[in-house]
Structures are given as structure tokens and as C-alpha cells.
From Swiss-Prot:
It comes from Geobacter sulfurreducens (strain ATCC 51573 / DSM 12127 / PCA). Belongs to the TRAFAC class TrmE-Era-EngA-EngB-Septin-like GTPase superfamily. EngB GTPase family. The lineage of its organism: Bacteria, Pseudomonadati, Thermodesulfobacteriota, Desulfuromonadia, Geobacterales. It comes from the Bacteria. Pfam families: MMR_HSR1 (PF01926). Keywords: Cell cycle, Cell division, GTP-binding, Magnesium, Metal-binding, Nucleotide-binding, Septation. One of its GO terms (molecular function) is metal ion binding. Mg(2+) binds at S38, T60. Residues 23-195 form the EngB-type G domain. This is Probable GTP-binding protein EngB. GTP binds at residues 31-38, 58-62, 76-79, 143-146, 174-176.
Length: 206
């Protein structure tokens, strides 16, 4: 998927009836607000603004679907851990995201994104724990690697690995500025997809 021929927004929603049919495999992206999720998706698909970036944490409160090369769906899930949003919005986030993750049969992998400069938060640990409980393949992408030195990156990678209980092959490094890690992340995603199954339309017999 390194060669991107098309990338387009499909739809947004908060409930299953808003989702696309589910006839394409889906890769979902999740993480705390402002970890660089939108920038990661834009670089992966070679687009500057397919996914809008925002300096306001918690701005994205919908599940957004993007079709790539007509053969794969990238799913942008709302960021968590945001402080400056109404309590009711925070209460809605959990059920909305859990409904998608637990019930989407075409979901092939979740990319959990963490900032290299931060210690993983409790929400990150709980999200990873939840995904593992549902046996959903996970790739942890460590973003903003251009913001720290190589020595600091190594220290933080070790800290993130210990905090989340990750093996080296469960992590990938990324920089939106230099595009470091783009090809490696696609390779990991494609390897995970190859181990999975062909999607069936949600609600239809297997």
C-alpha cells in the first residue's frame, strides 16, 4: 500500500447505522488527543489534508471513514483524554468507540498512537488491554520522533514498551515531518491484514 492511487472521505457517524457496508477491511486509528493521529493518516495516504488536523484537543467527535485505493478503509476514531470538552461528550465517547471496535467484523487492526515525549497514560494502557481482551491485532505507533534526540527516543521507547507491555515488533516509530516510518508502518499493517480474513458485509452470513 506504499503506492497510493486514491484516498477519499466516505462518511462520518456515531452509530452502526452510519457506518459503510463493511465490505472492505478496516484499519482503525486511536489515541489520546493531539498525539498526531491526523498527521499520521495524511502521511500514510500521501495527502496533506485528507484528515483535518486541529490544535484543539477533542475536536473530532465522530468516527470518520476514508477509502484508500478502493480496497481498504482507514477509520479515524475520536481522540480520548481530552479535558476541554463537555462531560456529556466524554460519556458518549466510550460507548461509541466500544460499539465500533467490538462489533465491526471487517476490522483487521487497530493502530494505537502514543507521543514519544509522553509517558503512556492510563487510558492508553486500558485501551491496549481492552483490544487484547477482544483479540484485536494492535500496532503501537510512536509519533513525533523528530521532536527528541536519538538517545531520548531510545529511553522513551523503552519506557513505553515497559509501561504497555509491548514486544519490539508491536511498535513502530513515526515522524510526520520527515515521513520516517511510513513504509515500515504500511508493511506491518499489510502483514497483519495478510494474517486475517476477507471481510464479510456486517450483518450478513459468514
Amino acid at each position: 500500500m506504499v503506492n497510493i492511487t486514491s484516498a477519499e472521505f466516505v462518511t462520518s457517524g456515531t452509530r452502526p447505522e452510519h457506518y459503510p457496508p463493511g465490505d472492505l477491511l478496516e484499519i482503525a486509528f486511536v489515541g489520546r488527543s493531539n498525539v498526531g493521529k491526523s498527521s499520521l493518516i495524511n502521511v500514510l495516504v500521501n495527502r496533506k489534508s485528507l484528515v483535518r488536523t486541529s490544535s484543539t484537543p477533542g475536536r473530532t467527535q465522530l468516527i470518520n471513514f476514508f477509502r484508500v485505493n478502493g480496497s481498504l478503509m482507514l477509520v479515524d476514531l475520536p481522540g480520548y483524554g481530552f479535558a476541554r470538552v463537555p462531560p456529556e461528550v466524554k460519556r458518549q465517547w466510550g460507548p461509541m468507540v466500544e460499539t465500533y471496535l467490538a462489533g465491526r467484523s471487517c476490522l483487521a487492526c487497530v493502530v494505537l498512537i502514543v507521543d514519544v515525549r509522553r509517558t503512556p497514560a492510563e487510558e492508553d494502557r486500558l485501551m491496549l488491554q481492552w483490544l487484547r481482551a477482544y483479540d484485536i491485532p494492535v500496532l503501537v505507533v510512536i509519533t513525533k520522533c523528530d521532536k527528541v534526540s536519538k538517545n531520548e527516543r531510545a529511553k522513551q521507547a523503552s519506557l513505553i514498551s515497559r509501561t504497555l507491555g509491548l514486544a519490539p515488533d508491536e511498535m513502530a516509530f513515526f515522524s510526520a515531518l520527515s515521513r520516517e516510518g511510513r513504509d515500515a508502518i504500511w508493511a506491518r499493517i499489510e502483514a497483519i491484514m495478510a494474517e486475517g480474513h476477507s471481510p464479510s458485509v456486517d450483518g450478513a452470513p459468514e
